[in-house]
Amino acid sequence: MVNSLLFGEMALAFGCPPGGGGGGCPGGGGGGGGAGPGPSPVTAALRDDLGSNIHLLKGLNVRFRCFLAKVHELERRNRLLEKQLEQQQSERERRLRYKTFSREQAVQTGPELLRPPAPGGGHGLSSGAAAGANANAVALGGLPPGGGSHPQHYGRLPGTIWSYTQVRRTGGGGVETVQGPGVSWVHPDGVGVQIDTITPEIRALYNVLAKVKRERDEYKRRWEEELAKRMNLQTMVDTLQEAAQEADAIQEEMNEKIERLKAELVVFKGLMSDPMTDLDTKIQEKAMKVDMDICRRIDITAKLCDVAQQRNSEDVSKIFQVVPKKKERKVASDDDISEQDGEVNRFSDDEVGSMNITDEMKRMFNQLRETFDFDDDCDSLTWEENEDTLLLWEDFTNCNPTIDLQGEQEENLGNLIHETESFFKTRDKEYQETIGQIELELATAKSDMNRHLHEYMEMCSMKRGLDVQMETCRRLIKGSADRNSPSPSSVASSDSGSTDEIQDEFEREADVEPMVS
């Protein structure tokens, strides 16, 4: 039926009636016009596809019918088992209701009271259960008097199977009845039945039910475990996603900071370009000043050498024997020296010799300062204090003053000498540091100058090559022009003139190169 309906729907979809009478329908014969053309490839493909689908549907229909048959059989057996269970349950309740004895007694049952079973069921009941049901019916008056048996008590019939009923007394005062010959049997899943009332099919069903319950519990436990794992994984995934979002936000902030710092760096470079230019200018000025100080240092060194030679050649004692009145006339402009001269007048005769030496040294230093005109405040280099040019008090060991010096005067003179030496050493250290810095700057400037000179020489060599090429081209042009006008003397003179010019230019460049190097 399903196949016919599907085939009818397919036929309607192709525009043909289910009978297939039209000539254009697939599978139908030609209409009243005679035999039509053969089926097209599309129609044949559709027909094959439809045939395969019909075959598949037939197979599914057969399987579905088998499944329905099995389902109906299982339903029938289930109804039968339910009916048997209801009968057994009702009989057990009836026995418990009417068989409550105070002592143990025997009961007779037999097949005489059995009736033929009903046509709808009852064939699966045991003989003892049927006999008990028939006996109960007779005792209650359910059987008619002419049914073939007398209404006697079922416990007094001969030829029956003996069973017993036991009454137990519990501790609480109650009474418990146990029915024989079977005993109570409790299923592991809590379903309580009696052994004598259970058929193998019911026992198998209980076993299957217990197995299904165990599998259900196992599946439930596994499902709960998987659910817990899934929840934990979901929590971890959410946490990782939040961490990834935070990392992305931090990365964006870092990129923004980097861009901002780059912009600030560009601005800072632009602002620092002017101070760098000023520093370069100051460095150049300092270099010029250093050159001037070097020249000044050479002059001062020469003057000091002359003074040392004069000291060695003449008597030092004559140089430093000066009257206090003469000192007042020569050094009246200096305030410090005038104060010292005033004090010298008040000194004793023993201190005159030491003061004369100190005043003479100061006078010589002032004379050198006035002669060469250098300042103490500026960074000019006075002279290089080494073993050859440094004037110390040790150089005046040959001086023999006329007045004997006392111990206190010698101590004062030594302190003055140490102070002067420390002052000159401090200034020398400062000058050496300044000289080192300036020499470093000069070395840098010289390296830059050498680089520029090399570049200039390369450009000069390129210019020389270009000049040679231009002169060659000029000669070629003049030669081609002179071919038309035959004047060999003029051509020779012009060639000699150009050759002389090139030679002079080469000589000038050769003179310039040694000077540059």
Curated annotation (Swiss-Prot):
It comes from the Eukaryota. InterPro entries: IF_rod_dom (IPR039008). Keywords: Coiled coil, Intermediate filament. Residues 501-517 have a biased composition (Acidic residues). Residues 104-129, 330-349, 478-517 are annotated as: Disordered. Residues 485-497 have a biased composition (Low complexity). GO terms for cellular component: intermediate filament. Pfam families: Filament. Residues 53-484 form the IF rod domain. Belongs to the intermediate filament family. This is Intermediate filament family orphan 2. It comes from Homo sapiens. The lineage of its organism: Eukaryota, Metazoa, Chordata, Craniata, Vertebrata. The gene is IFFO2.
